[in-house]
């Protein structure tokens, strides 16, 4: 089993299906947690995978036993148990190589931020902005005369508006970087790992 630490490397290093499945599980875990905590929780859940399994085939086996996933999640103290359990049960049916934004958003507990975080970091030249507190703080630091939301917008129209503004600002501030690289630079500056 390979362990990943997405606090030290760009997730765009996800080179195969295995790594993308692992990263999507991490993306679900990181909602509401620090990247360091989510990295550890993902590892604690995934460390028992056999070398011939992918994260999703492993989870499918765990899910077959009615309460086993719930027991594992509680054992590793991941929190948000109902949301995460339902989300994991939904995502194992996705093809991480081809899933779309709409496919991800159709999964329980996967919102705009998580879906875009996954796609931005696993698709070459993806045009998304992850409106987490780091990007929003960064925007506010750049635009002292504009009021930027403190939290991720929940309405589709507001998310689309601020995503457009964030993409424009990221491209202007980091013209030589992909949006994923620019997002990682902002995260390194504003995150409490």
Task: Please give the residue ranges for each predicted region.
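Alpha-helical ds-nucleic-acid-binding substructure associated with the helix-hairpin-helix region
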Residues: 44-108
């Amino acid at each position: 089993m390979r362990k990943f630490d997405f606090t030290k490397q760009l997730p765009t290093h996800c080179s195969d299906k295995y790594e993308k499945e692992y990263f999507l599980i991490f993306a679900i875990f990181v909602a509401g947690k620090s990247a360091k905590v989510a990295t550890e929780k993902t590892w604690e859940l995934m460390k028992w995978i056999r070398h011939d399994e992918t994260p999703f085939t492993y989870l499918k086996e765990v899910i077959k036993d009615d309460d086993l996933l719930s027991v594992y999640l509680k054992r590793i103290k991941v929190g948000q148990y109902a949301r995460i359990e339902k989300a994991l049960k939904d995502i194992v049916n996705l093809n991480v190589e081809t899933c779309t934004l709409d496919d991800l958003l159709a999964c329980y507990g996967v919102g705009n931020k998580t879906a875009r975080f996954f796609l931005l970091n696993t698709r070459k030249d993806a045009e998304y902005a992850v409106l987490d507190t780091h990007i929003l703080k960064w925007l506010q630091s750049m635009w002292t005369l504009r009021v930027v939301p403190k939290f991720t917008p929940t309405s589709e129209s507001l998310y689309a508006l601020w995503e457009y503004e964030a993409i424009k600002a990221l491209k202007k501030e980091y013209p030589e970087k992909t949006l994923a690289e620019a997002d990682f630079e902002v995260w390194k500056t504003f995150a409490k790992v």
